[in-house]
Each structure stands twice: as C-alpha cells, then as structure tokens.
Amino acid sequence: AASLHKSYASELNVVGWAMGGTVTRMADWLRYIDGTGGAGFAVAALGGISSVDNDLQWVQDNLTPLGKIVLEKSKHSCMYKNLLEEAYKRFISDTYFQGGSAFFENSDAMYALNKYNLGADGSKVPSAPVFMFHARNDIVVPYAMAQGTARSWCQQGAQIRFTTYAGVEMGHTSAGIASLPDVLHF
C-alpha cells in the first residue's frame, strides 16, 4: 500500500506507514519459503496472486486435482491452518500444477512476480515516512530482502526508519509483537 499510495489512493492523507517482516521480492521469497515449515505461506501467496493477476492465470488453469483441493482449502482457512497442513511441502512443483517444477525458469512467471517487488520501481516509492522493522533471525522472510528494499527506497528519496530486532528470540511473529510500542510511537 505504501508504494502504491500515489497511484491508487492519493486522496488519502497518509502521514506514515509501518511494516515489518515484509515480503519485498516475491519470486525470491517463494523460492526461499517453498518446502520449508512456512510453505503454507507460499500456497496462500501464489494462490491469491494467481487468482487476480492475469499474467499468472496459467497457474490457476494448470492446477492438478490435488492443487485445486489445496488452493480451495487455503482460501477458506486461517493462515495457521495452512501453515500446519502444508508445512515442508513443495507447492511450486508438478504435483500441484502442471509446469510447477519449471516455474522459476518461466519468463512470464518471473515478469508477473517481479511486478510485486518493492523498491525496484522509482515511481512506486512511499511519499509518507515509513517505519520498517524486521528480525535478523526471521525464518519466514529473509532479513536481507527488507533491508535491501529500505536502502533502495532511501536512495529514491523515501524517508525510512529501519529497526532491526537482533535478539535470538526475535523471529517473524515475535518481532511484530515487540515492535508495537515503536509502531505506535512512530
């Protein structure tokens, strides 16, 4: 929302944004998370994007019977149920949709996913100040992704305050909780 504000809802008087644990490079993140304990996130992300983005419609069109079941269940389940049921599975595979094993080599797929990269398009830079936070030990979204986006946005003129939660106890969810006082103060 922060990167689309100028083109999507410019009439809103946004005075600041706060975000943390944010996926900023979709293809890289899908490659990273698929097959891990967080694979349920990949199911929800790819299912959601492919249902609304015509450039990824072929994912929906080429779902296997199992892929259709999994995506339909994910639409009606909370994220934690998706995480439990899809943990350590490789969703981006031929098991779930035809062409899945070659997904990351498909130039059309990469074009579509790269549209969701934050910080890459100079016309999509937050105009209001941004408070970004991320746990260095986040196993759901790699720290370097968020840090890279913050740097890119800063180089493009955005006002970014980036906070790192470095404790070993800090992960994807715990950093979100720990950041609440900073978010409210921001």
PLM regions: where:
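A conserved short beta-strand
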Residues: 9-24
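Extracellular/periplasmic catalytic domains that process cell-envelope and extracellular macromolecules
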Residues: 11, 122-126
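C-terminal catalytic histidine-bearing segment of alpha/beta-hydrolase fold enzymes
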Residues: 31, 105, 110-113, 137, ...
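Hydrophobic/aromatic beta-strand patches that form the interior of the parallel beta-sheet core
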Residues: 18, 131-133, 163
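Short beta-strand/loop motif that positions the catalytic acidic residue
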Residues: 125-126, 130-138
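Short glycine-enriched nucleophile-adjacent loop
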Residues: 1-8
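Accessory cap/linker subdomain of secreted extracellular hydrolases
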Residues: 20-121
